[in-house]
């Protein structure tokens, strides 16, 4: 069951892009960038559409929140693939953390892999690096 967005978001009319002020910036962790490079071209095209038309417009409305070790992260499903991301609403940023296939019970499962990266501290480091690039220096 999909959760409704916490704050109302104006969704552009069909074929219309959100204005720069309304759209979320999409940022990628190094691991997510590597995940995307490893995808087949047609899957990358599908992913690009998901990112531009859905997650950049209304990431809460098109995603589902995760629980457990990945609480505060969201997922969007397309085919057998998942995009795992974190939303920073005050910054209007969606940080893409991982892209991969759901293989329940398999060590290659996207959720198991991301939990492992999170437990190691590498995910926090990568997110901090992504945010550091967009935050003004103080």
Where are these regions (language model features)?
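N-terminal "first-domain core" detector
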Residues: 2-39, 43
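Short acidic loop-to-beta-strand element that houses the catalytic metal-binding Asp/Glu
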Residues: 82-84
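A short, surface-exposed loop/turn module that caps and links secondary-structure elements
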Residues: 52-77
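Enriched for short, Lys/Arg-rich terminal
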Residues: 1-13, 19, 86-138
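Negatively charged, low-complexity tracts enriched in Asp/Glu with abundant Ser/Thr
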Residues: 38-54
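A generic structural signal for beta-strand entry/edge sites
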Residues: 23, 73, 91-93
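A generic beta-sheet turn/junction motif
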Residues: 78-80, 89
């Amino acid at each position: 069951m999909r959760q409704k967005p916490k704050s109302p978001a104006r969704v552009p009319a069909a074929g219309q892009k959100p204005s720069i002020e309304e759209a979320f910036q999409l940022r990628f962790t190094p691991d997510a960038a590597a995940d995307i490079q490893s995808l087949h071209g047609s899957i990358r095209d599908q992913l690009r559409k998901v990112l531009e038309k859905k997650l950049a417009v209304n990431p809460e409305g098109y995603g589902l929140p995760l629980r457990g070790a990945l609480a505060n992260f969201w997922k969007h499903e397309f085919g057998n693939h998942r995009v795992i991301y974190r939303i920073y609403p005050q910054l209007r940023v969606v940080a893409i953390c991982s892209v991969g296939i759901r293989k329940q019970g398999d060590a290659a499962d996207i959720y198991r892999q991301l939990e492992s990266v999170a437990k190691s501290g590498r995910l926090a480091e990568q997110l901090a690096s992504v945010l550091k690039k967009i935050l003004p220096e103080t």
